[in-house]
């Protein structure tokens, strides 16, 4: 989600500032917490959020969703989903959208596009009887992101359903990898991109069209992590829109 659909980390678009930190200091302290304690970086930022909010901000699902309402989206994102789904339907292809993110599920659920996804896989909190977040419920990092691709492939979407480990015949796969398109922006997406690529699907790297910094997508292309790259402009008629429609056309032909 972050820097794929939105130009910045979701936590940095209101929450961090609301608890008295500047963004750079927050992430520096969070990363130091992780490295100094052999701690997952995502668990570290979640703990930092919880501790920083004490005495300054209600740390509830509702407040986190409010922060999500402030998250900016790249051009064209808001109407992308219906447009691409409609194009797919017109060409005999059922299109579904999923989120696999190391960001916060609660914030994503507060965004304008939350209802466009069949399933949101992201880090999230457990809440006590007062509705206050007290413990991580789920943490999604760059390596365990891949499990969700297998869940999507097999149609076993419940995160606690062990059926994802069952053996499926190729013709039983609900969404074969060859029909998947994975869009991401950085190294955290590499395991998923590689998995989709080697199984015949399509991985696309995106970069911020305003900064025009292609460093990460060039690196991913050189290392065969992605098949294509494009500016993160989701507007109709732009490069990404044209590319996705071409992939839908190819899928329909096969």
Residue ranges and their predicted role:
Residues 1-129, 224-227:
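Alpha-helical substrate-recognition element adjacent to the catalytic core
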Residues 13, 25, 127, 147, ...:
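Acidic, low-complexity intrinsically disordered regions
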Residues 34, 44-49, 126-161:
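Low-complexity, serine/threonine/proline-enriched polar segments
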Residues 77, 165-166, 189, 213:
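Amphipathic coiled-coil/heptad-repeat helices and related helical stalk/stem segments
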Residues 110-138, 197-204, 208:
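Extended low-complexity acidic/polar segments
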Residues 145-188:
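Conserved Lys-Pro-Asp/Glu-containing loop-to-beta segment of HAD-superfamily phosphomonoesterases
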Residues 175-254:
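Mg2+-dependent phosphoryl-transfer enzymes with acidic/Ser/Thr/Gly-rich catalytic loops
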